[in-house]
């Protein structure tokens, strides 16, 4: 089984290929919002590095968000098109799950925080379990100050990870028992996507391309701006 993982939910574009033998090749780049221009060359690069032909891919996995609306649309649309063309199933994974996954060996409460722009964060809480992580809360949207209050209320050691944690570091760095993970793990990675998708694929927990939808949690900024203008006197 070979899985192609595509992640464009944040400022970073990440692509990976892997399967039973683990991750065979991966790449990530941050080029502003040039997701469409970066994605195809990234797919070509990892396939070449892994010595894999696209026709050998048996599952396409994609980051469903939450994250940047434009990036999500690019990644999900491309993943759907590839799965349809290759006639293979798909697996979708949350960006917050992907951000939390590299910390699966931590005994602390894991808090993933992805920058939602507009002074807000997409967040969820996780705990280490045998073989990975378990989400303890629904995905939700909060302000940095509200998340800070949530962390204070837990009264246990926490590890805070994600580009939202990095952006609003000054809000969290004074909190007792809260460790902020540095920028190296700030973005979801397609390598984590491949590993999580592989576990789901073994359980045949996949979906048809037309059934897979992005996880937005909030209206697009363009729609919010339009509604704001309509509400003005």
Please tell me what each predicted stretch does.
Residues 22, 34, 89-188, 202, ...:
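Surface "functional belts" at beta-alpha junctions
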Residues 1-66, 187:
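N-terminal beta-alpha supersecondary unit
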Residues 61-90:
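DPxDG-like acidic metal-binding loop motif
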Residues 48, 52, 152, 199-206, ...:
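Generic secondary-structure signature for well-ordered alpha-helical cores
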Residues 57, 206-209:
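Flexible, glycine/charged-enriched surface loops at secondary-structure junctions
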Residues 46-50, 85, 103, 190-201:
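Stable alpha-helical structural segments in soluble proteins, enriched in small hydrophobic residues
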């Amino acid at each position: 089984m070979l899985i192609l993982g595509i992640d464009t939910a944040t400022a970073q574009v990440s692509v990976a290929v892997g399967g039973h033998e683990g991750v065979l090749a991966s790449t990530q780049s941050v080029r502003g919002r040039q997701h469409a221009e970066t994605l195809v060359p990234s797919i070509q690069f990892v396939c070449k590095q892994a010595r894999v032909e696209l026709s050998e891919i048996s599952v396409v996995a994609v980051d469903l968000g939450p994250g940047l609306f434009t990036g999500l649309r690019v990644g999900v649309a491309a993943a759907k098109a590839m799965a349809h063309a290759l006639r293979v199933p798909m697996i979708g994974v949350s960006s917050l799950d992907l951000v939390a996954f590299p910390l699966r060996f931590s005994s602390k409460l894991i808090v993933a925080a992805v920058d939602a722009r507009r002074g807000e964060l997409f967040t969820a809480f996780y705990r280490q379990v045998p073989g990975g992580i378990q989400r303890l809360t629904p995905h939700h949207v909060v302000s940095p100050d509200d998340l800070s209050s949530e962390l204070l209320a837990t009264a246990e050691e926490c590890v805070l990870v994600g580009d939202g944690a990095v952006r609003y570091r000054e809000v969290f760095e004074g909190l007792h028992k809260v460790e902020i993970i540095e920028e190296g793990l700030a973005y979801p990675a397609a390598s984590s996507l491949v590993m999580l998708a592989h576990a789901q694929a073994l359980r045949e927990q996949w979906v048809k391309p037309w059934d897979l939808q992005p996880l937005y949690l909030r209206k697009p900024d363009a729609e919010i701006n339009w509604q704001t203008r309509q509400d003005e006197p």
